[in-house]
Amino acid sequence: MAEYTAGTSPLVDLINSLPDSDGTWGPPITNETTLNGVPYAPFSKSDKLGRMADWTDAKDGRDGRGRQQYNRNYRDQQVYGAGSASLFAPPAAEDEASFSVVSNVRDTGKTRFGRGAIFTRGRGQRGRGGQDTRGGGRQQFQRGGRGGQQYGGGGYSDRGGGRGGGARGRRFGWKDYDKPQRNRDASVNIRPDWKLLEEIDYNRLSKLNLDTDEGEDVDSYGFLYYYDRSYDKPPVKSAERKLAVVDRAVYNVTTSSDPIIQELAEKDEATIFATDSILSMLMCAPRSMYPWDIIIVRQGNKVFLDKRDNAALDMVTVNENAADAPLEASEGSKDVINQPGALAEEATYINHNFVNQVVLESSNQKVDMANENPFHSASEETEPPASKAYKYRRFDLSTSEETPTYLVVRTELDAVQKNPTSGEDQFVTVHALNEFDSKAQGSGGALDWRTKLVSQRGAVVATEMKNNSCKLARWTVQSILAKADVMKLGFVSRVTPKANDKHVILGCVGWKPKDFANQMNLQLSNGWGIVRTIADMCLQREEGKYVLVKDPNKNILRLYEVPANGLDDDDEGPEPEGVAEEED
């Protein structure tokens, strides 16, 4: 065996070459890994901190709720200091370890909305045009029996379902795939021979702008009763005022059937003619969600904005703009009174009677306009006319002095009241908001009016502005067009949430129309720009008939050119199932 000496042994040389460790074991401590003598591990503030260990989970790390739950619990679970290598290594182009995609797409519910049929077909309208030029569309609202009003699916049909996600978004739950989605039907049947001319989305409409003057009065007709100021006071619980049925003759005559507009057109007073109901729908189009249609007739150099009988825009919608709008009740459900069609008919009925109830009918105290009601015939009517004044007003929509363009619109006023300061007469428009059930689906998070209307009136009105943006905007535009001094909004609720045939009046609040428009961020210049744009589209084409249709499921307006007989009775849509007709 070979013998090694101390001076020549390789092992001894290796040991002697090691640094002095001062009695410690292991590699020496360098300054690079100490901070004031305290060892530390390099780390970055951007490192994500997670659980070091979770002894409560199953060994496979999954809780049985699927991949989505697994990703949410274990995404980016990094241990302390795991990112220290990034201090010395060059940064990667894309760090996919901490990158995740979260979908922010809202689950948009699609509602199936159908025709705009008015109540029942008993004592109907007095025929538009043709035989009686002064006739036209007086609407009779009829009541049902013990079961309340006989509502069909005529107003707005909504067969959709599902637990609509609203603004919060949601995950699909058990059998969500098996629940019907909301798809609305168009308000008018689109025929194959209709020619699509224009397609305008809401973004383009919102950018239009046209400044106009406040308009001038051309002529006035009808009369007005004085408003009953006692409805402005909060009712006492023991003496609540119930909504009464007031039978008065009310007329809803379209533009081309109005004898006064026909006379003004013959005198060449304007280029565009419309009624306040049709014009307000067009001016507030970017706020609308439900389908509607407007008939546009060009004769020579004139444009008439018309509507069909019992059109969708005649109905008073309920919570149209709510995040979770009312749904069509499922088959066999008992909640049929809270479906969109029933709510629209109920709201229309309430508005018809409310405006007639809040006036003081007295032949000695009323304000007569320059002319009598052009639609009422005392020899033919059995009911007295309602308090209504029709003011025909003209607006200048010219964009240059070379080609003047004027619009004549028939506006309506509902009552008159004395100014408490000056004692002068103020013109009033009256409308009613209705509460059906604050806890039901489709209520839009509305407060209980009976307990909150007096103490939190601002919150109640703000909620209604959100849920009924289109309806309130239309009422405000109509008040401004008529140059009304005050716009009265009544608050009407059901006596019991489960019955829609009895209502109680909770109060009435008045606003100046322009102030209310500012609160709603309503710009009339945008509305006038929409009207002028649509009119120019028709004036640039040949004479004929056109139909402007709101897409039932998209924020788009479509302009169609239709043949002369392209809007027959067949285009009114199929008769809703289950509509009960009543005879007087």
Curated annotation (Swiss-Prot):
Component of the eukaryotic translation initiation factor 3 (eIF-3) complex. mRNA cap-binding component of the eukaryotic translation initiation factor 3 (eIF-3) complex, which is involved in protein synthesis of a specialized repertoire of mRNAs and, together with other initiation factors, stimulates binding of mRNA and methionyl-tRNAi to the 40S ribosome. The eIF-3 complex specifically targets and initiates translation of a subset of mRNAs involved in cell proliferation. In the eIF-3 complex, eif3d specifically recognizes and binds the 7-methylguanosine cap of a subset of mRNAs. The keyword Secreted does not apply. Pfam families: eIF-3_zeta (PF05091). Coiled coil: none annotated. Its main location: cytoplasm. Residues 312-326 are annotated as: RNA gate. It comes from Chaetomium globosum (strain ATCC 6205 / CBS 148.51 / DSM 1962 / NBRC 6347 / NRRL 1970) (Soil fungus). The lineage of its organism: Eukaryota, Fungi, Dikarya, Ascomycota, Pezizomycotina. InterPro entries: eIF3d. This is Eukaryotic translation initiation factor 3 subunit D.
